[in-house]
């Protein structure tokens, strides 16, 4: 079948016109302009709905973390192939043993870096790092508006207090901060308080009640913490969307994703993938050059098709 093609960036109204042209060019030529480095599965929080979280003693059972040398070499090759936007995430990325070396080296290479963190550790040496090499932005996941809710959701004491302190330090340094929340039964009572916290601190805020099943982790606890009402509302909105914007089967399925032909995700153990939630394809960045791995990923995406039923 011959498919219609349309880059998802054409539907991203918020994207600057100049950058939209850049992304269109990247889409046309399959240039990996945007990447995510999942530095580590380590995390100081213990959220039941997280799909990338291992205790240090368990990491070796599932794989081996990439070293600073490996991440830096991947970044050099990715830059040569066109990567400009880079998201650094985890787990909690600040817990990678070589975070400082990795981050500062990548910053010196000129990437537009967004850091995704829970915000708990933003103090001391990390403040100095971000003062010297400010990221383009920091996205912090807000789990509640009190220490009590952080204890329920994340299993950690003084969570909100520490995160609030980190946010204020970042604001003082004028580093752009964005707050995001996943709303569950454990924190729904503080949803409005979280939104108000973002408002009074003049920080962009987004929340979701949708907890996606991930095939990278067992999902046994997810049904227990999902907010059923949010699921129903979400389903209704999804149905309305597809009534008004029916899926075009003449259009290649991957083109509905903004990262198709221009974005990638590299896992903590060195697999390059299309999406953070998937456990395939199994393309090892340790065994191939970045260019070869990217080409294989694009080929994998191009082979994806609609299901028969």
Task: Give the positions of each predicted feature.
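Radical SAM enzyme [4Fe-4S]-AdoMet core and its adjacent flexible, acidic
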Residues: 1, 136, 141-261, 265-269, ...
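Flexible mid-to-C-terminal extensions adjoining Fe-S/redox cofactors in radical SAM and related proteins
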Residues: 1-25, 29-31, 254, 269-309
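Short, intrinsically disordered, charge-biased short linear motifs at domain edges
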Residues: 33-34, 238-246, 299-305
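Alpha-helix N-cap/helix-start and coil->helix boundary motif
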Residues: 44, 100, 146-147, 291
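Residues that scaffold the ATP/ADP-binding catalytic core of kinase and kinase-like folds
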Residues: 46, 50, 125, 148-149, ...
